[in-house]
Swiss-Prot record:
Name by which UniProt lists this protein: Zinc finger protein 114
Subcellular location: Nucleus
Gene3D superfamilies attached to this UniProt entry: 6.10.140.140, Classic Zinc Finger
Annotated function: May be involved in transcriptional regulation.
Ranges annotated as spanning the membrane: none
GO molecular function, one term: zinc ion binding
Taxonomic path: Eukaryota, Metazoa, Chordata, Craniata, Vertebrata
Origin species: Homo sapiens
Span list, region Disordered: 95-116, 280-301
Span of zinc fingers (C2H2-type): 304-326, 332-354, 361-382, 388-410
């Protein structure tokens, strides 16, 4: 039993304008690539008029001159001038009917019946003016392609053997809307497939890439960190934000930070967590002299107590600083005015007054010596002037700090429920 030939109507997919608007860009690109693929392959094996003998059955054209309704047309790249340009270069001397040469300089095929069939529908006396290379083979795709075909050439006889899957033979055209019911297999994002690319092998051991399994939705460009895949390299570059998203890498605890401050904070947390683990496991602390104080801090026990008042501290240094209160020791003395202080911090704060206030202001009313910057604020205390007024309740204040403190009371007020 002979196999039926494949026409373009068997593999074409048509969308209405309404259906086309429902497709996303990825689906539109997939549709365009599949239709261009089918048109190229069918134009490759197409011929104008099949070679006829007295017993041969005329075969229909694979690419019929079909006109689609205006409502079902979809704007695609024109392929007729690129992939279907054929010319009458071949003639059979018995029938004197022209044969057109397909793309890539491959001679037009004729449909061959099975071995036990008769009559033979192949013209055996092809005398071609142009001789192609002796061997041409189209390797079929291993994925879900629309059709699989093997085109062979032996001397001057051409054979075309279409091979269709069972599921592919059940596709029927819906006459109501002019749309071919066709199931597209979508591959999930980041999932690997076993689909391979089809290739065209020439006689000079050259391999030309034909397709990348675009009819199954397989993505060629994949981004490993999150498993997200993209069909086009440009989409991958636009998506390539993982490298610049977080610049600072915290390698010890495998966290990432956006700036140095967070990085330093993570370092402190990591160190504290490590020290806590050392205390629980009994490991020796890196700071041996303070290992006892560190252990008491982790356990919450204050081991250093003041003999005078009984106050306890975590660290011995805190206890030594506290003891100065009981002894009355003030070792830090100002060299300009002779005033003594218990802590160096207080002395440094006192020295700023001598440096900044070279010419202090003395109030004429009360004789108080104040800084020049606080002169006008002090004068308002004598005049009673209150230039700062609350817009909510109308209360006046002599200092801006008093107004700011008052405004917080309005923010804390809750409306009546």
């Amino acid at each position: 039993m002979s196999q039926d030939s494949v026409t373009f109507a068997d593999v074409a997919v048509n969308f209405t304008k309404e259906e086309w608007t429902l497709l996303d860009p990825a689906q539109r690109n997939l549709y365009r690539d599949v239709m261009l693929e089918n048109s190229r392959n069918l134009a490759f094996i197409d011929w104008a008029t099949p070679c006829k003998t007295k017993d041969a059955t005329p075969q229909p054209d694979i690419l019929p001159k079909r006109t689609f309704p205006e409502a079902n047309r979809v704007c695609l790249t024109s392929i007729s001038s690129q992939h279907s340009t054929l010319r009458e270069d071949w003639r059979c001397p018995k029938t004197e009917e022209p044969h057109r040469q397909g793309v890539n300089n491959v001679k037009p095929p004729a449909v061959a019946p099975e071995k036990d069939e008769s009559p033979v529908s192949i013209c055996e006396d092809h005398e071609m003016r142009n001789h192609s290379k002796p061997t041409c083979r189209l390797v079929p795709s291993q994925g879900d392609s629309i059709r699989q075909c093997i085109l062979t050439r032996d001397s001057s006889i051409f054979k075309y053997n279409p091979v269709l899957n069972d599921s592919q033979k059940t596709h029927e055209n819906n006459e109501d809307d002019g749309v071919l019911g066709w199931n597209i297999q979508w591959v999930p994002c980041g999932r690997k497939t076993e689909l391979k690319s089809s290739t065209w092998t020439g006689s000079q051991n050259t391999v030309h890439h034909i397709r990348d399994e675009i009819d199954t939705g397989a993505n060629r460009h994949q981004r490993n960190p999150f498993g997200k895949a993209f069909r086009e390299d440009g989409s991958l570059r636009a998506h390539n934000t993982h490298g610049r998203e977080k610049m600072y890498d915290f390698t010890q605890c495998e966290n990432t930070s956006r700036n140095n401050s967070i990085h330093a904070m993570q370092m402190q947390l990591y160190t504290a967590e490590t020290n806590k683990k050392d205390c629980q496991t009994g490991a020796t602390s890196a700071n041996a002299p303070n290992s006892g104080s560190h252990k008491s801090h982790c356990t919450g026990e204050k081991t250093h107590k003041c003999p005078e008042c009984g106050r306890a501290f975590f660290y011995q240094s805190f206890l030594m600083r506290h003891m100065k209160i009981h002894t009355g020791e003030k070792p830090y003395e100002c060299g300009k005015c002779g005033k003594a202080f218990r802590y160096s911090l207080h002395l440094n704060k006192h020295l700023r007054k001598h440096v900044v206030q070279k010419k202090p202001y003395e109030c004429e009313e009360c004789g108080k010596v104040i800084r020049e910057s606080s002169k006008y604020t002090h004068i308002r205390s004598h005049t009673g002037e209150k230039p700062y007024k609350c817009k909510t309740c109308g209360k006046d204040f002599a200092k801006s700090s008093g107004l700011k403190k008052h405004l917080k009371t309005h923010k804390d007020e809750k409306p009546c429920e």
